[in-house]
């Protein structure tokens, strides 16, 4: 990766857009409020960078390293984050609407109150994430790993969670209306107060789960329809 001085970064960011920043090293850089919309940042090193309130809408961040970066209230609408590393990243209140995060790694990331509506998160590793009050409505989470994650009060309306790993996830008071949970693993998950109206739980594993009414799941029928 190409490492840059503070002056070089300042000079570069004031050039005509969109910028070509593939494989650039901006780790630890102070980039708050910066406009990097539509920029090419594939495989860039942005680890520990300060990107609070940054505009990264439509940016190409494929396989970029954003681990432990700060992206508070950043705009990442329509951004391409496929295979990106977002481990332990602060994504509080970030806008990831319609963004792509296929095979992304976001272990222990903070996505509290984030907008992930219609985002594509297929096979994303979001183990132990904070997603309380996040908007995941209509998101594609097929095969995603959300084990141990905090999804309390989250909006998962019409989300596709087919084959998702939700073991020990806290889904208390979450909206799972019309969600597709086919073949999902909800073992030991907490569903207290969750709304499962019209949710599809066919083939889902619920052993040890705490159900919306506070009871522990015991029966194992062949097919379950939320209601």
Specify the residue positions occupied by each region the protein language model found:
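Tandem repeat scaffolds
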Residues: 3-227
């Amino acid at each position: 990766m190409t490492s840059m001085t503070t002056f070089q970064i300042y000079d570069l960011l004031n050039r005509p857009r969109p910028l070509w920043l593939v494989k650039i090293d901006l780790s630890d850089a102070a980039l708050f409020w910066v406009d990097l919309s539509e920029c090419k940042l594939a495989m860039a090193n942005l680890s520990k960078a300060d990107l609070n309130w940054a505009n990264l809408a439509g940016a190409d961040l494929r396989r970029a390293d954003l681990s432990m970066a700060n992206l508070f209230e950043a705009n990442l609408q329509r951004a391409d984050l496929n295979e990106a590393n977002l481990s332990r990243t602060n994504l509080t209140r970030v806008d990831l609407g319609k963004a792509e995060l296929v095979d992304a790694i976001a272990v222990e990331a903070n996505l509290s109150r984030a907008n992930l509506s219609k985002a594509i998160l297929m096979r994303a590793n979001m183990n132990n994430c904070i997603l309380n009050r996040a908007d995941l409505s209509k998101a594609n989470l097929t095969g995603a790993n959300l084990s141990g994650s905090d999804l309390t009060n989250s909006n998962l309306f019409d989300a596709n969670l087919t084959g998702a790993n939700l073991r020990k996830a806290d889904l208390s008071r979450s909206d799972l209306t019309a969600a597709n949970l086919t073949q999902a693993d909800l073992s030991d998950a907490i569903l207290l107060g969750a709304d499962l109206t019209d949710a599809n739980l066919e083939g889902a594993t619920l052993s040890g789960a705490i159900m919306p009414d506070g009871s522990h799941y015991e029966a194992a029928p062949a097919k379950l329809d939320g209601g």
